[in-house]
Amino acid sequence: MIDKREPVPFEVYEPGVYLHGTKADLAVGEMLVPGRESNFEAGRVMNYVYFTATLDAATWGAELSAGEGRGRIFVVEPMGEFEDDPNVTNKKFAGNPTQSFRSREPLRVVGELVDWVGHSPEKLQAMRGGLQRKEPGQIED
């Protein structure tokens, strides 16, 4: 039986597997590259591509990114060096418990998770409210 539960914060999806949540229509083999518009701030070009090792963080990306329809979660492979995402590292929690990363190098799409479960409507509404209170440019690009 497959466990159909909400994602658990800080729980690594599978060791060595990286995820990217978005509403973009991507295919296996495509590259995610820096230099595209932010999913969270209209008109802002991003210098990095972001990804995570946790299903929870990828789910937030899929649910909160710009665009219509249901989000998607892709399995990605970093094509170069990457670092802890400074937007979340050592902020609310010590270290990088969300296992969130960024890179100036491309990420290759190697698969897609198709049967993931999203956050509850209440959690989603609370997160959207928190993001609306952030000042433009508060997230490093």
Predicted segments, located by residue:
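Active-site and NAD+-binding cores of ADP-ribose-processing enzymes
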Residues: 23, 30-31, 66-141
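Short active-site loop/helix that positions an aromatic residue
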Residues: 55-69
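ADP-ribose/NAD+-binding catalytic cleft of ART/PARP-like enzymes
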Residues: 1-49, 63-64
